Structures are given as C-alpha cells and as structure tokens.
C-alpha cells in the first residue's frame, strides 16, 4: 500500500547514487519517491567533499532537473518519514531550518537558520553551545569481557594440516554487499594464515556490551 521509496546513498563506505540515479533518469521514473541521502560520512570526506551539497553537484552534473534534485534532498525524504508537516519545505507552521547557498554551481552554504534563528554567517558560528555533560550511566560502556590481543585473531587449523580450504567474503568497492569466494590458505604452526597475494585478510567483530 505504501509503495517503495528509493534512497540513493553517497556516503564514505557506500556510494551508489550515480548508478541508481542513471537508472532513474534513463527510465524516466517518477522522482517523488526517490531521495538522495549520505548514510555515514567520515569527517575527512565532510571536510573535503561536503555533504548533500556534494551529492547535488554530482546529480546536476549528470543532467538531473534542478527542481527535482532539490526535492530529492528535502521534501521527498521528509515525506518518506512522515515529517513533511515539520520539515522539507518552507511554509507557515513548519520548522524554519534553512540553508542559503551560493547556487547550483557549488551549493556553498552562506547562511544557516535553525528554528528561524540564524546560527551561521559565511561559515562562522554565531551562537555558543555548551559542552554536553553526560550521566555516568552512559560513560565507559565499551567493556570487553576479554582483552583483545594478537592471539585473539588466530584461527586454529585441524591437527597436522598444511593448508585449509576457506570460505571468505569478497567485498565490493563502495558497496554494502559481499560475494562468496572459496580459497586455499596456508597453515603455519597450526594457525591459518592470511594471504595478501589472494587479498585475504582477517576481519573480526567484537561485541562491546557483554
């Protein structure tokens, strides 16, 4: 009943907006249910590339209509989360969160308003924010049951094995998907070794709350 809302990510780890946008444009799809988002962005990328301004430059460079591009980073996403009565557009009764930019050439932010209050001017912060103080219960929560050492990453092979067959994840550049890859890895002193020549490295997930 609700249909499907497409969110095209252009972040640091996942970058698929240009590929998806090309498909949308080539097939003349209705963009009302399409948004441009960033997902996670590293601080270095924020500093060097920008945020949604960078995505807008990319989209317009691909030939996307200007109005549709603006809608994709504002009202479309607000509608997807049923927040369009508060944000996503300029209208009486809505939150006056506004960025004034230089225009479609580079979208450099000149002035920012939050809740109708001007908080930046030409990149300078006009308001003062106190450093947040946190309750003790939310501090020092990353407690590992067992300390992590180099030995934590050792994978022991069956006794007497010189090589083992292993199932590994084949990661794709800037895509949140993996492919299956079957490899044969060497064993040294009973421990399965990484193999740089095959681009096989260890990866581990450590639960921090147990």
Predicted regions, residues:
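Short amphipathic alpha-helices and their capping/turn segments at secondary-structure boundaries
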Residues: 20-28
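Short acidic/histidine-rich active-site segments
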Residues: 7-14, 30-50
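Active-site-adjacent beta->alpha loops and helix N-cap segments on the catalytic face
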Residues: 17
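Hydrophobic, small-residue-rich alpha-helical packing segments that form membrane-like cores
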Residues: 1-5
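Active-site microenvironment of metallo-dependent hydrolases
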Residues: 44-63, 67-208
């Amino acid at each position: 009943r609700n249909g499907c809302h497409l969110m095209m990510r252009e972040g640091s780890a996942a970058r698929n907006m240009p590929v998806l946008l090309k498909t949308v444009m080539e097939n003349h799809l209705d963009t009302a249910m399409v948004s441009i988002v960033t997902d996670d962005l590293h601080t270095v990328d924020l500093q060097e590339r920008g945020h949604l301004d960078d995505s807008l430059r990319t989209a317009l460079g691909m030939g996307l209509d200007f109005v549709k591009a603006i809608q994709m980073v504002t009202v479309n996403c607000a509608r997807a989360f049923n927040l369009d009565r508060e944000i996503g557009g300029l209208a009486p009764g809505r939150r006056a969160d506004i960025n004034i930019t230089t225009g479609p050439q580079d979208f450099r932010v000149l002035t920012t308003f939050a809740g109708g209050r001007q908080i930046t001017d030409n990149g300078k912060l006009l308001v003062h924010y106190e450093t947040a103080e946190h309750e003790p219960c939310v501090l020092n929560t990353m407690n590992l049951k067992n300390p992590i050492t180099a030995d934590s990453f050792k994978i022991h092979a069956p006794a007497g094995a010189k090589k083992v067959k292993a199932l590994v994840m084949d990661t794709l550049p800037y895509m949140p998907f993996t492919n299956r890859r079957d490899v044969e890895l060497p064993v040294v002193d009973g421990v399965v070794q990484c193999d740089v020549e095959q681009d096989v490295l260890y990866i581990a997930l450590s639960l921090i709350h147990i």
